[in-house]
């Protein structure tokens, strides 16, 4: 039987109870993972360690995170709370471990959100330069910082359903653009078979382990659907499903995109790439698509910043109810 976490999710808060559908809860985890942004550079870093075992690194990372997700899903079935891992770990391991987990997540959401605002400016500026704007325009960069920092906060405050739908739409657009590029790579190469990758040419176990650890970073945030336990219509089902489905679906996306990048460039070309996705579009003869990739990654950064605000604010709400944060945050 599911339970609430206790006083930290009382009805006197501003949270709307039982309003989010399963897709809207799922959008939280997917947006927080920022799959399009993750694929912008992370596969290159994994490649430097794992080589042609790049796709296998992401595959093993997926397996590990599915196991972690299964454990989180069991808590999500039983405890509906805005505090997610803070409450779950407290129930399982005690207050000390719970506080450490909670504050760790809050700091993670904070720094990830800041990184997303920076990424929003970088890729937004890249998109505008591609349209003909002069590079290094400080006024435009300042506007992008303001838009990337304030707009997610405004959307987050307005309504959780609007917030989740916006995150879902933006991430869906960016993922679709990158999948179009992957299809173009396979068509350009005459198929999906890459002998070097599928035979793990030059494979080294040590490099694979390091690559797997790096790949796991791409899954950070998939647990954040747990923070919507109070607001989900059917939290006992939607929260566990969102955690597991987001991990599985985005993990498959990572496998496809990382494989396609190395397939498109080849090992030598990939090692020299500085901006793999836009350069890959040029490589397969779809130069104009690079502009759409830039705006897609910009959307992904925005959606991730929004998801960090949603999850982090609910974590602080739980802290406030437990006396770990100012009481003003409890309403």
Model regions and ranges:
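Membrane-interface "cap" regions at the ends of multi-pass membrane proteins
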Residues: 1-43, 47-53, 65-70, 195-196
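Helix-loop-helix connectors at the membrane interface of multi-pass transporters/channels
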Residues: 6, 87-90, 117-143, 177, ...
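Helix-loop-helix junctions that connect adjacent transmembrane segments
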Residues: 11-15, 55, 132-141, 169-295
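Membrane-water interface regions at transmembrane-helix termini and the short interhelical loops
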Residues: 16, 75-78, 100, 147-173, ...
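Select transmembrane alpha-helical segments in multipass membrane proteins
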Residues: 19-29, 94-107, 145-148, 202-215, ...
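Extracellular loop-to-transmembrane helix junctions
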Residues: 35-135, 140, 144, 246-249, ...
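Transmembrane alpha-helical segments of multi-pass small-molecule transport proteins
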Residues: 59-60, 128-160, 175-182
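Membrane-helix boundary/coupling elements in multi-pass transport proteins
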Residues: 81, 104-119, 219, 224-232, ...
